[in-house]
Amino acid sequence: MGYFISELTYEELAPLLTEEAVIVLPIGGGSKEHGNHLPMGTDYFVTDYVAQEVTKRCDVLTLPTLPYAYFPAFVKWKGSVSIEHKHFTDYVQDILLSFVRFGVRKFLIIDGGVSTHPPLCLLARDLDNSHNVKVAVSDIRGLAAETENELCTQKQGGHGDESETSTMLYLHENLVHMDKAVEEYSEEFPNTIVNGHRKIYFSSRMNTLNGINGNSTLATKEKGERILQAMVDSICDFLKEYIPWMPEAED
């Protein structure tokens, strides 16, 4: 079992900040459109839940969930907050370096976004080279991929879809408006994705009428429970190896 840093006193936290410690930073958008049926804080709710469950099972020190990040595909949707990617990575770096200066060398970012993943991975590489610390970054597209493939029948998805709606039905059913759930799919530029494989990167924004990509009408609470459990299990499986492991000392 781990600890939530915000619940500890300074006297309790200070001796835990060792070279062997793993600091967890969850990141999930707290104000980002998810269609007309899901709350703006969907990413935050899901990421925060996963972080809480991981902390209950693993010997980690978990920071409060960061609710604002880099979400450029949603800047045209009212109320959706996006932090410019350089500001975002600088901010996250400052958070991590606040612990590096006291000897911590291992971090895990629980990343609840898609657009946040590339800049966070670049930051992880930079900190490895500059400070010899390891920053692992979870990938929301892969954490529960096998379970989603088993349970979900939508032809494609990615935002406010069958999977995401299912997780919110499990976590906060009172915030989900299934009477407004729809099936709609965002359009990709021709020949950038072929047979499910991305061939060419092509910048795009959320372009559907209701702001989702997938079939949210197929969502169920039962699917959501299993998908969330798979996310937690994937991270805990990684942490079993990561917690006892130490980065090599520099020459």
Regions found by a protein language model. Give the residues of each.
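Extended, histidine- and acidic-residue-enriched regions that form the cofactor-binding/catalytic faces
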Residues: M1-L108, V114-D251
